Amino acid sequence: KSGYVGDIIPRGEHHYGQWMNNHYLYAVKKAADYKICVNGHEAVRPTGLCRTYPNLIGNESARGTEYEAFGGSKPFHTTLLPFNRLIGGPMDYTPGIFDTKLDFMGDLPHGQVQTTLAKQLALYVTLYSPLQMAADLVENYEKHMDAFQFIKDVAVDWDDSEYIEAEPGDYITVARKAKGTDNWFVGGITDENARTAGFTLDFLTPGKQYVATLYADGKDADYKENPTSYQIKKGIVTNKTKISVWEARSGGFALSLIEATPAEKKSVKKWK
């Protein structure tokens, strides 16, 4: 991981001036010589450089998760990123915050990550990066190990991506096929307005059965009042199954679709 946070800049150069632009490129090239991967933070927005230098596996280069609490990023921010920042390459957004209220840190200007817990899971799919973080404290994950299972299961590299529905600034739902497998993961997020996402799993292989595990906002979930309310549902699905998921204000959902084993085909109930 490479980064230049705050005033740690060589020669006092401007953070995003020409000298530093040249320096960021130099760092990526030099790392490639030694077969070292780079995840750059505080660098300029990438413009497809990872195509030439695939060792550049990710950049921050936009307001990440910390700005939701410290800098006042709004709930719609993450619904825009796939259409602007991520066009230039993978983004290390550092998702996975389960305890979104930061009262223990004292008097912060905003003091809360502006999402529900379920939306944090969805970001692992909607915001592409081949290197993902579990950015919260261990003790916060220990309180919700059933939800943490999605972070353990979700892939980080993909063979295929399907953008199911989207309206920049409002909502987005993405399905991705895990590289080298027939497993899929779906993530859906919304802005400050609650909504219901609806879609058919027609991207799945016809004739196959999958175990679907849905991590969704609870009925009383709200990003300000009750961000940790979530529910988990499991069932057998096919490419003809229709999914309908309610998303709370600044909420979302994550859905894993894993090929069913012979035993699971008998023991897991059909999706309803």
Task: Give the label of every model feature segment.
Residues 35-42, 69-70, 132-144, 160-162, ...:
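Acidic/polar loop patches that form or flank catalytic/metal-binding clefts of enzymes
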Residues 234-271:
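C-terminal beta-strand-rich structural cap/linker in extracellular carbohydrate-active enzymes
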Residues 136-185, 220-226:
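Glycan-recognition and catalytic regions of carbohydrate-active enzymes
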Residues 214-240:
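Solvent-exposed beta-strand/loop surfaces of large extracellular or lumenal domains
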Residues 168-210, 253-256:
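Carbohydrate-binding surface patches
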Residues 38, 126, 186, 250:
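Conserved, mostly hydrophobic/aromatic
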Residues 47, 98-136:
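Charge-patterned, long linear interaction tracts outside catalytic cores
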Residues 1-111:
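Aromatic- and carboxylate-enriched substrate-binding clefts and catalytic-loop regions
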